[in-house]
């Protein structure tokens, strides 16, 4: 019996033009290019400079332009728009609706979803559910963040890590034995204090006090985040590999969330996957949140082949994490 599969048929991405270098960071806090590169693996990150009317939807529209230049599509054929972001333009209206309007997607529904740095793989999970149900045939996923709005550039622990960016993907129905195969998704809200932005929500709405107390900036316990990120990403990847009877040699690519280089190396070392098969671009972009996996796919697209076996894995605030196993959907043009 034929089975409907969900397959990625196109990708796009965009990062702002402005490069915030380690040298510039070192003028703001007590650090150095050498220390940041050694400890985090980042040389520079892209920042969306504050300008009136420009937020994450601006980056998203640029990413969709890139997608359209790589893989032309008809906006009227899109059934749903899923936008994974922790930094929407506004509390409401949702950013997905604004993007759909500007792209000309008029026959679809859309919503924002928030899973922090795990947003892209969570969105893939939702898109797959829509498609294999038979109700929807083409879903646009957008995943991105303007994390610079959460950064206290006087904080040595967080200011070097994060950058801004956005990626997107078309996910379509196919009867071929290709596309998304299996996944494991998890969350754990038992220690939210380890990685958070506590200001601006319904518990701590914006006031002079929340601003003065810096509740609108990201705070993390780096050691706790490192430990949980490595153990949970490695564990879900290993379980997914075993569940699908894969050998390590069969995996063509691992695409990890670009949290920091030490986390990426620790996870792939656990999996015994060689560096040559791991997509890493954190040196150029930093941690771009939900955008990091699709930005890697954009950069490596020309090296991908139809049927390549791939593992995506991510970890983010919440905690949220997971891993996705898929067979790549097309040969690059």
UniProtKB/Swiss-Prot annotation:
Pathway given in the UniProt record: Lipid metabolism; fatty acid biosynthesis
Uppermost EC category: transferase
Gene Ontology cellular-component terms listed: cytoplasm
NCBIfam families, sorted: fabH, PRK09352.1
Domain text: The last Arg residue of the ACP-binding site is essential for the weak association between ACP/AcpP and FabH.
Summary of the function given for this chain in its UniProt record: Catalyzes the condensation reaction of fatty acid synthesis by the addition to an acyl acceptor of two carbons from malonyl-ACP. Catalyzes the first condensation reaction which initiates fatty acid synthesis and may therefore play a role in governing the total rate of fatty acid production. Possesses both acetoacetyl-ACP synthase and acetyl transacylase activities. Its substrate specificity determines the biosynthesis of branched-chain and/or straight-chain of fatty acids.
Protein name: Beta-ketoacyl-[acyl-carrier-protein] synthase III
């Amino acid at each position: 019996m034929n089975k409907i599969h969900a397959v990625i048929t196109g990708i796009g991405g965009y990062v702002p033009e402005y490069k915030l270098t380690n040298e510039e960071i070192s003028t703001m806090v007590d650090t150095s290019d050498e220390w940041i590169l050694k400890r985090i693996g980042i040389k520079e990150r892209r920042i969306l400079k504050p300008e009136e009317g420009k937020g994450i939807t601006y980056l998203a529209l640029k990413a969709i332009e890139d997608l359209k230049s790589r893989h032309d599509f008809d906006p009227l054929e899109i059934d749903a728009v899923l936008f994974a972001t922790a930094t929407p333009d506004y509390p409401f209206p949702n950013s997905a609706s604004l993007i759909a309007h500007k792209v000309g997607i008029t026959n679809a529904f859309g919503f924002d979803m928030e899973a922090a740095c795990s947003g892209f793989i969570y969105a893939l999970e939702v898109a797959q559910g829509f498609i294999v149900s038979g109700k929807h045939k083409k879903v646009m996923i957008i995943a991105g963040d303007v994390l610079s709005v959460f950064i206290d550039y006087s904080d040595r622990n967080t200011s070097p890590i994060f950058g801004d960016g956005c990626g997107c993907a078309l996910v379509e129905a196919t009867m071929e034995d290709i596309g998304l195969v299996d996944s494991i998704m998890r969350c754990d809200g038992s220690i939210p204090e380890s990685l958070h932005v506590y200001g601006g929500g319904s518990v701590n709405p914006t006031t002079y006090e929340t601003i003065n107390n810096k509740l609108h900036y990201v705070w993390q316990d780096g050691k706790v985040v490192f430990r949980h990120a490595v153990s949970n990403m490695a564990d879900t990847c290993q379980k997914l590999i075993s569940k699908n009877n894969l050998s390590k040699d069969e995996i063509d690519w691992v695409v990890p969330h670009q949290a920091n280089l030490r986390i990426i190396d620790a996870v792939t070392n656990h999996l015994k996957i060689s560096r040559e098969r791991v997509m890493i671009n954190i040196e150029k972009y930093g941690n771009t949140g939900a955008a990091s996996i699709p930005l890697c796919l954009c950069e490596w697209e020309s090296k991908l082949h139809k049927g390549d076996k791939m593992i995506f894995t991510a970890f983010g605030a919440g905690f949220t994490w997971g891993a996705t196993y898929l067979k790549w959907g097309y040969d690059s043009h």
